[in-house]
Structure formats: structure tokens, C-alpha cells
Amino acid sequence: MGVPTLFKKIISNKFYKNIHKGIRDGQTKCNYFFMDYNGIVYNAYENIKKDIEENNYSKDKIEHLVLEEVINITKKLICTVIQPSKITYIALDGPAPRAKMVQQRSRRYKAVMEKDFMKELKNKFKINESKDIWDRSANISPGTEFMEKLSNRIIKAMKEKTFQTHNKNMKVIFNNGNTPGEGEHKFLGLLRDMRKMESKKDDKIYVIINSSQMGET
């Protein structure tokens, strides 16, 4: 639930002179890297969607491919593109407030109705329909079996030091989907606490990937 075009407006505003509009692999200094993770999961699915559609994969196989693609994207972002020196904070969306749950339910009911309507039209006019074996919206939601698998896969990668950069002092913190609140709310709370504790002399640089704004810039 992002504010449309907000991030694009901020980085295009001359007032925010300290905001980098582009990051080259390993060439932009970064101390803290915050990842609102749900958007990365969606991107991972899109990356392998064609392969899934061309092959008769089982549900378990699809989920395995999505999980491994998520880990590959995460490793590239942390170890090659951003290379944070101090902390990487990965946050999954947890249970939403009741008001948002109601809104999400309404939106998903509408999406199902539209999908059924489009299916009827395609059948009527004999248009080939691509198979949607794995419903990403239903699976990439707090409390699902897939999100539990994702949490376990991230924890495994952390134990295996998959996300370790050349800086051995860099720590990876993972906040899973069992904690209430959206990913950005979780790390913004941590950011506020860090700002209170930090010295004014310290030059800290933060990089934030937000799920609702990833495709905007």
C-alpha cells in the first residue's frame, strides 16, 4: 500500500540533493541496506514465469524455483550491487491492520471475479488462455505455507553465509512474516531508533528497497 509515484517525486526534487538516483555495482558507499522483501518475491516469480508456463512443473517444483530465484536476487543485491558495510535488514510483511485486511479481501474478491469474467470471454471467442498454475497473490501473503518456506530458506541462507560480503563485520537481520506490520513500517521504526542514537559526526548512508515503488523509477 504505497503512495503512487511518491518515491519518484522525491528523487526528482532538487531539494533532496543527497539522494542517489542510480547505484552502480559496488561503486556507491552504503552502510545500511533495508529490504522490504515482498516485492523481491514478486520479481523472482516474474523472472521464471516463462519457464514455468513452458513446462509442466508441480506446485512444489514451482515454489522451489521461486525460492532459489529469491535467494539469487538477494545475494546479487547484497554482495554485488549494494555491498553494505554494517547492516542488511530484511523484512517480510506480517499480518496487516484489520482495516487493510478488509480492503485486501475486497480487492482479491474483485480480482477473482474479473479473472472468471475474462476466462468466460476467452472461451466464448476461443482465445488460448495461459495456465496459471501458481497463484502468486494467494501465496505471497502473510501466514501462508509458502511464506513459511521462504522464511526457512532465508534463515538457511544466513546460516550458510550466502549473503556475506567482503566485509565480514556486516550483519544480516531478518524480520519474518510472523511479526505484525508491513516491511517498510518495520525498518522505518528501526531507522528512527538508530537516528536517535547516532552521533551527528557520523556520515551514514542508507539504501532502501521498497516493494510498492520498485518498478517506478
Model region roles, listed by residue range:
Residues M1-T217:
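Noncatalytic, typically N-terminal accessory segments of nucleic acid-processing enzymes
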